[in-house]
Swiss-Prot record:
Pfam families, per database record: EFG_C (PF00679), GTP_EFTU (PF00009), GTP_EFTU_D2 (PF03144), LepA_C (PF06421)
Reactions catalysed, as given in the entry: GTP + H2O = GDP + phosphate + H(+)
Listed CDD domains: EF4_II, EF4_III, LepA, lepA_C
InterPro entries in UniProt: EF-4, EFG_III/V, EFG_V-like, EFTu-like_2, G_TR_CS, GUFP, LepA_C_sf, LepA_CTD
Keywords assigned: Chloroplast, GTP-binding, Hydrolase, Nucleotide-binding, Plastid, Protein biosynthesis, Transit peptide
MF GO annotations: GTP binding; GTPase activity; ribosome binding
Protein name: Translation factor GUF1 homolog, chloroplastic
Amino acid sequence: MATDLSSSSTLLLSRNCKTPPFYHTTNSLSLSKTHHLYASRNAVVSRLRLLCQTTGSTQSTPTSGVSDLQFAAQVGQHRLSKVPISNIRNFCIIAHIDHGKSTLADKLLQVTGTVQQREMKEQFLDNMDLERERGITIKLQAARMRYVYENKPYCLNLIDTPGHVDFSYEVSRSLAACEGALLVVDASQGVEAQTLANVYLALENNLEIIPVLNKIDLPGSEPDRVIQEIEEVIGLDCSNAIRCSAKEGIGIIDILNAIVERIPSPRNTAEMPLRTLIFDSYYDPYRGVIVYFRVLDGSIKKGDRIYFMASKKDYFADEIGVLSPNQMQVEELYAGEVGYLSASIRSVADARVGDTITHYNRRAQSSLPGYKEATPMVFCGLFPVDADQFPEVRDALEKLQLNDAALKFEPETSSAMGFGFRCGFLGLLHMEIVQERLEREYNLSLITTAPSVVYRVNCVDGDTVECSNPSLLPEPGKRRSIEEPLVKIEMLTPKDYIGPLMELAQDRRGEFKEMRFITNSRASITYELPLAEMVGDFFDQLKSRSKGYASMEYTFIGYKESDLIKLEIQINGDPVEPLATIVHKDKAYPVGRALTQKLKELIPRQMFKVPIQACIGSKVIASEALPAIRKDVLAKCYGGDISRKKKLLKKQAEGKKRMKAIGKVDVPQEAFMAVLKLEKKPWSYKYKMSVNC
């Protein structure tokens, strides 16, 4: 079958031509022109022969007598052949969650022949089990693709990014390593809140943005309406927007051609001293720290002595290579290319994300501007169930922090739970993902305290103290005022749900700022509200009240003084530190009442009566009593003298009194999350802790 390599038709890299899979492609925006093309092994050989001619490679092309493994190896080697820097394109895919980023990345890998059909699976770049189970992207991933356009080979470096607001830091790291971005918008849902946030990040990095309308094959898709939304809300010119269906393979070639035509190539700075920017890294137990980097200036070879400018450490580059998408070794990487590095780095602190790598003997004059430091917004305590696992928890957090630069932690002690760590996260989903990764990847058993935010306490002596742990809040006589963090939240919703969402924001002490209609049927509502009011079930309530149609995006704007107090929980007369929380004075009573009632349901009944109290200082504002389990000590008495029964009842009462004084109350794990009524999965509840009461 003859194949025109210069046309924008789809070429399928398939060895078996008897039952070849197929792709849809279109050379225009009309679905009626969709056609199917089949390519056999001979077409692949022809394409590789063209690559050899255009790159000047002397390696022979695959012949009919080579084996499957040899054939695949030769395909891989041609992907590694060098191309001019003018033929390199670095781009990422940004979008709102569930708009089809990972599916589009899968199809790009498949159409360019980077991944063979038999190796293909859904969410190919999502390596973690958590990502596949939840259907979301958590970690950015990179892949190198080879594409022939107008008889010239191009190297396309793709970086797939997360879509959830909690992982916007991952997106910012991807953008710093690219010159362009594919802005993917669901043609049926339209512009969402995170779409706006990602576009603003891309514009700040001066990226060329290519609008892509995905899922046009759905019956409810409205591409014309969505194009109008993008132009009115974002201000992008969508006259050349690409309409595609990543699932069906429609418009994929148009996207690849647009990447080549519209995204600029990197600057040619190969003669300058080496400067590479680390945009990701992870810890391998056998090879040490593996660094993902983008070469901005100069070139790096295998065996070079390299220097990390921030940590001031030097190593020898034992192995360098590209991600295609699996790691493939090369001898040298030049300016504009993206790759990985292994240098037997054993200390996780020596290769931080955002650091600059240069040559040890020919150092660059200045380091590259690193990333904006991630600011944790939500804090909670992580404690091992087994106190002997404290060193393992510390090592696991250090290794996880290497791969997740937004994670912050410091040691913490609690009279109830012993030694642990106070950890900072970007949001609730980030917190949940980190805890589950610690339990899955490092086999740890953890207890999580209720999440909180960082408060600023202005003391009477003039000092300002930041407090993320309610149990460490200064005494009332030592503090003058308390400031809480504020966020600006933008909710995009159909007009039918404007009322319920405004009611939700006002119930959470929100201050209305602006409302504007994006289209006749969709509106944008802006509020300022305390971050503490969002830490909980705010997102769940937003989805519930809008029947799943609304989306939100928030940004931190600063601190504001507020009338806040510390609410303590006492069980059997003793305070339980992990259950302490900071609340607004007007909400103290309803929160205390709801919390004591919730704890009464969660704490198992004891052999003695257990009082559960919510206190502000020494004042009890809400109280519940957990009744004792009654044992019928008179069951064996069948008549007889009444004094015998009185003696047994008196003995039982004395025993209960003694037990109440020295007894222990088991507080289940879900009690710590009950402070904010978080709905956790069953695996979070399987551990209990004992509080001496």
